[in-house]
């Protein structure tokens, strides 16, 4: 189901997960080829907790779905996914996936960056902190780069955030366990398949 309303700040956990992608570092694989890397992330609007993230050679719908599936399996189902109008996000498959897991999708209006401000701000932080500290000569596989990113995200989630009244994103996210709507593993597997079918 697709919605068309203007998002305001959502203070409740699992009300909204905002997803986006960003160009990451360039990875030189063992065959000597240099590859552009994409980072796909999902952030909980209320807590700034990174619920899903991964690195890929391609920025596409299938890779986005894998991030969404892992996040839903681990952290529950948000009421709303907030995405931009890119082809990886705005399609019938996305609407079908959201409906299957009991969620909905909002697509940000063009040229309104405030609707995705938190995830875009997080990507800037990631680049300033994680990417700026990488020596890419140490990385030749996605798996190794992924491990480094996961370590950074874990540290970020546990650091006190200036907007959370002295709490970390992790503390804020897990402060309201009654908000979590969990799906059985078999339900997730049935709902998120490649490609989705009606």
Briefly describe each language-model feature range:
Residues 56-60:
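A short acidic/small-residue loop/turn micro-motif
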Residues 141-158, 162:
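A conserved active-site cap/scaffold subdomain adjacent to cofactor or substrate pockets
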Residues 158-198:
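C-terminal, beta-rich DNA-binding module of retroviral/retroelements integrases
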Residues 81-85, 89-100, 105-131, 140-146:
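RNase H-like two-metal-ion nuclease catalytic core shared by retroviral integrases
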Residues 72-75, 105, 126, 130-134, ...:
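A generic secondary-structure signal for well-formed alpha-helical elements
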Residues 1-41, 49-50, 61-67, 74-79, ...:
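Mobile-element integrase/transposase regions
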Residues 21, 45, 85:
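Residues immediately flanking
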Residues 48-52, 106-108:
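Short small-residue beta-strand/loop micro-motif enriched in glycine and branched aliphatics
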């Amino acid at each position: 189901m697709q919605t068309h309303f203007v998002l305001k700040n959502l203070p409740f956990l699992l009300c909204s997960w905002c997803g986006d992608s960003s160009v990451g570092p360039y990875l030189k694989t063992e065959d000597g080829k240099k590859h552009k890397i994409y980072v796909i992330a999902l952030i909980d609007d209320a807590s700034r907790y990174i619920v899903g993230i991964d690195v890929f050679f391609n920025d596409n719908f299938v890779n986005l779905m894998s991030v969404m599936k892992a996040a839903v399996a681990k952290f529950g189902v948000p009421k709303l996914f907030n995405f931009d109008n890119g082809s990886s996000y705005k399609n019938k498959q996305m609407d079908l996936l959201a409906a299957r897991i009991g969620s909905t999708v909002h697509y940000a209006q063009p040229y309104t960056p405030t609707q995705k401000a938190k995830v875009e701000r997080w990507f800037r932080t990631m680049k300033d902190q994680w990417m700026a500290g990488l020596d890419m000569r140490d990385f030749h596989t996605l798996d190794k780069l992924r491990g480094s990113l996961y370590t950074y995200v874990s540290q970020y989630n546990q650091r006190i955030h200036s907007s959370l009244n002295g709490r970390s994103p992790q503390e804020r996210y897990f402060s309201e366990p009654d908000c979590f709507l969990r799906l059985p593993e078999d339900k997730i597997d049935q709902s998120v398949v490649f490609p989705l079918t009606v």
